[in-house]
Amino acid sequence: MSSHPQTFYQLTGRGHAPANLSNATLLVIDAQEEYRSGVVQLPGLDAAQVEIAKLLDAVRAQGGAIVHIKHLGIPGGLLDPRGPRGAHLPEVAPLPGEIVVEKRMPNAFSGTELHEKLQSLGHLD
């Protein structure tokens, strides 16, 4: 087993050039406090958060676009949009000017403006 995550291209033995970050859009999906301190805590979240932060730094440095996807859960329940567990993880939270798309379904395209936002950015990678 590999000591670091691999892409689908690597897992299938295909090569692929790295994305051009200045022409890329990074999607950060559901990086929310519920997964660190709520009832659906994820193992390995701290390590994942470090990697997300590295990606954010790299894309920001190259002027790429960033879209944060935030799940709006049930008031008083999972991913409570009014409570602290529904908040973005502060270490990887959106900066002013970065796009935030709020979703209520597991599919970030369902009932959101994600498709339109991505199309308007016009990025290829």
What are these regions (language model features)?
Residues 1-100:
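Active-site acidic carboxylates
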Residues 94-125:
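Internal catalytic-core helix/loop-beta-alpha segment
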